[in-house]
């Protein structure tokens, strides 16, 4: 079994023998996309809601796709687009892919009342992008004030969540 740890601003895809891990999710959101027919999927560790700057992504195919110089994969919109692209490259059809999302916590007290927090912004941005991409969210554990670490088992599509205060 191949285990890959995905840090903030990174993503990875793999097949049935892979376990993708996103350690230390606070306000970050882990987006797990899974194709049950092909037993393959990917995980993006998203830091920020959206990239308003034009970024060029490295298109080189590797097992792991790290952020380029402009750190485009930190952003929900760019990371989800890239994750979908990589799964298509592996033979997945968009209609066969479902999503599971985790994280988006409020780790610190909001200092300015009425402002939407980073965790909440990340969650909303991820939901919006997945809806736009016609990928249903079938499971989630988001928000609150606890950190999370996740392990995504591509053989089954199961996700193990560890919470911490």
Language model region names:
Residues 106-119:
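Phosphate/ribose-phosphate-bearing ligand recognition and processing surfaces
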Residues 118-165:
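Divalent-metal-activated hydrolytic enzyme cores
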Residues 95-103:
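Short glycine-rich phosphate-binding loop at a beta-alpha junction
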Residues 7, 14, 25-27, 95, ...:
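Short, basic and Ser/Thr-rich N-terminal targeting/leader segments
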Residues 76-83, 97, 122, 126, ...:
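Amphipathic alpha-helical interface surfaces
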Residues 2-19, 23, 37:
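Phosphate-centric recognition/catalysis
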Residues 47-50, 103-107, 143-145:
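Acidic, glycine-rich active-site loops and adjacent beta-strand->loop/helix elements
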Residues 21-90:
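Conserved mixed alpha/beta catalytic, RNA-binding, or beta-rich assembly cores of soluble enzyme
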